[in-house]
Design a protein with these regions (language model features):
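Radical SAM [4Fe-4S] cluster-binding motif and immediate context
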Residues: 1-113
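Mobile, glycine- and charge-enriched loop segments
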Residues: 105-131
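Catalytic cores of alpha/beta
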Residues: 65-70, 129-146
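Short, hinge-like loop/turn segments at secondary-structure boundaries
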Residues: 40-41, 138, 167-170
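Short beta-strand segments at enzyme active-site cores
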Residues: 21-25, 119-123, 151-152
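Radical SAM enzyme core and accessory elements
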Residues: 201-377
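Flexible glycine/acidic-rich beta-alpha junction loops that bind and position SAM and/or redox cofactors
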Residues: 33-34, 84, 90-95, 125-134, ...
Length: 377
């Protein structure tokens, strides 16, 4: 391990120059607890309010004093990358890892409760004993932890690695050029790799971007599970030819709404006599889905999209799926005048009757979303 006094000097250099982000390259930064604790304490004590430090850790190795220290840090001071790779016990054993997933899940949830740390969790496709169904389960296990980023990677069969040695036994086929990415295994044929590539793309666009958080929470109950949502969304992109074209942010919303409409119609067709497509939330997550509504309809999804859009920015042009604001313009103008609402803020009337004020001068320090409050006009 690098001398701690030298590390402190180097850290101070970054802090003095207000470097936006510093990444530690240790694969398991917290394997030596005293070393990790000293560094975390130093960056907390010398926080410049700007620099973010990225660490790759094993969450199930974190100790109580480390968690307590993390809970006191400035939002955004550190972010954690946690390599789960798989939740299949046979897979974990085959890659010579030890991981207590229930313990890891508990710690990830605890860190979530601090509301000050970005967590990035990863899964690796192409590992031994992990077929498509097993990866499906691993995905749902990790997705349920709601990390800020869920990174789907594909096995790299590096020269000299254990996976390279086991190529024949595991039936691994990989690219001949760097980074030697897996193309198939005994358990996961090339066709399934391609399907997972599409899932990865959808997760990157609609989950990891953070731009569709409330919309995705609203849409999820329409599907058997989270993996199925992204799988079907990817299939929709391919069917419509959308995967071959680059799209604007607004177009991504329109495509998702188009997808939801088709899904609602298909589900409605399977229910005799249902003229108004409405799907009950099987998980009963009323507080989380559709901004407090227990059912998903096209209108509620559209409202969730408007909410997500205005959380990020005060739109210059109105989306095609926005609720008509014209009947409320006079009342909104009068409210702005009386309450001296700054021009930078936005007021939106939703289909459910709620009126929300988006304050862009006060943003969430971790997610950078606008502060929101309900008003009466």
């Amino acid at each position: 391990f690098r001398d701690l006094e030298l590390v402190k000097k180097e850290l101070q250099f970054f802090l003095d120059h207000k470097v936006p982000q510093v990444k530690f390259v240790d694969r398991t930064f917290n394997c030596k607890h005293d070393h990790a604790m000293t560094i975390w304490q130093y960056i907390k004590d010398h926080d410049n309010g700007i620099t973010n430090f990225h660490f790759e850790i094993s969450a199930d190795l974190l100790r109580e004093n480390e968690l307590e220290l993390m809970s006191t840090m400035r939002p955004g001071l550190i972010q954690l990358e946690i390599g789960v790779q798989s939740t299949n016990p046979d897979t974990i054993r085959a890659i010579h890892r030890t991981m207590d997933f229930p313990k890891l899940a508990g710690i990830v949830n605890r860190i979530h409760s601090f509301k000050n740390i970005h967590q990035h969790l990863d899964l690796i496709a192409g590992l031994p004993y992990e077929d498509y169904d097993s990866f499906h389960r691993s995905f749902n296990d990790v997705y349920a932890l709601r990390p800020q980023q869920l990174q789907l990677g594909f096995l790299k069969v590096l020269k000299g690695s254990h996976m390279k040695e086991m190529t024949e036994e595991y039936g691994i086929v990989h690219k001949e050029l760097e980074p030697y990415e897996v193309l198939g295994t005994r358990w996961l044929p090339y066709e399934d790799i391609l399907k997972l590539k599409m899932v990865e793309s959808m997760v990157e666009l609609y989950y990891n971007s953070g731009q569709f958080q409330n919309t995705i929470a609203c849409v999820e109950p329409l599907f058997e599970d989270a993996f199925t949502l992204y799988e079907k969304l990817g299939q929709f992109y391919e069917k419509k030819g959308y995967s071959e074209i680059s799209h604007s942010r607004m177009r991504r919303y329109e495509i998702l709404l188009e997808f939801v409409k088709e899904e609602l119609e298909e589900q409605s067709a399977g229910k005799s006599g249902n003229q108004d497509p409405e799907v009950e939330n099987p998980a009963g997550k009323a507080a989380e889905d559709c901004r407090g509504m227990e059912t998903a309809t096209w209108e509620k999804v559209a409202d969730s999209m408007i909410y997500d859009l205005y959380l990020r920015e005060n739109l210059k042009s109105h989306p095609s799926f926005e609720y008509d604001q014209k009947p409320y313009e006079k009342a909104v103008w009068e409210y702005r005048r009386q309450e001296k609402v700054p021009k930078t803020a936005h007021i939106e009337v939703f289909r459910d009757g709620k009126i929300l004020l988006f304050d862009y001068e006060n943003r969430d320090p971790l997610l950078h979303n606008a502060a929101v409050k309900e008003i009466q006009i």
